[in-house]
Amino acid sequence: MTLTHMNIIMAFSMSLVGLLMYRSHLMSALLCLEGMMLSLFVLAALTILNSHFTLANMMPIILLVFAACEAAIGLALLVTISNTYGTDYVQNLNLLQC
């Protein structure tokens, strides 16, 4: 495993730790999810380029498309929640509260 792969895996794990620690605000959770998706994209692209696996060339692009869709839906949800509740706390998303 090269140093580049270790750095990308460390970036993914730091984003995961950030998602687990800073989950009170929706914006910080979305930023951590975006960091995880981008590190997965870079890792997939580098792995495919290094292994010369030509059948999976489209996999990083598909992952990037899903990341863009996730970001768009997350930002739309953030705008809706901040307009409705006035804050972006994740506790406001509990549907079981009356």
From Swiss-Prot:
Keyword NAD: yes
Major location category of this protein: mitochondrion
Cellular component, GO annotation: mitochondrial inner membrane; respiratory chain complex I
Subcellular location: Mitochondrion inner membrane
Tagged with keyword Lipoprotein: no
Keywords in alphabetical order: Electron transport, Membrane, Mitochondrion, Mitochondrion inner membrane, NAD, Respiratory chain, Translocase, Transmembrane, Transmembrane helix, Transport, Ubiquinone
Enzymatic reactions: a ubiquinone + NADH + 5 H(+)(in) = a ubiquinol + NAD(+) + 4 H(+)(out)
Spans traversing the lipid bilayer: 1-21, 29-49, 61-81
Origin: domain of life: Eukaryota
Enzyme Commission number: 7.1.1.2
InterPro entries xrefs: NADH_UbQ_OxRdtase_chain4L/K (IPR001133), NUOK/Mnh_C1-like (IPR039428)
Topology term for the membrane: Multi-pass membrane protein
Pfam families: Oxidored_q2
GO biological process, alphabetically ordered: ATP synthesis coupled electron transport
GO molecular function: NADH dehydrogenase (ubiquinone) activity
Subunit description: Core subunit of respiratory chain NADH dehydrogenase (Complex I) which is composed of 45 different subunits.
Function per UniProt: Core subunit of the mitochondrial membrane respiratory chain NADH dehydrogenase (Complex I) which catalyzes electron transfer from NADH through the respiratory chain, using ubiquinone as an electron acceptor. Part of the enzyme membrane arm which is embedded in the lipid bilayer and involved in proton translocation.
Family: Belongs to the complex I subunit 4L family.
Matching PANTHER family: NADH-UBIQUINONE OXIDOREDUCTASE CHAIN 4L, NADH-UBIQUINONE OXIDOREDUCTASE SUBUNIT ND4L
Name used for this protein in its record: NADH-ubiquinone oxidoreductase chain 4L
Species per Swiss-Prot/TrEMBL record: Balaena mysticetus (Bowhead whale)
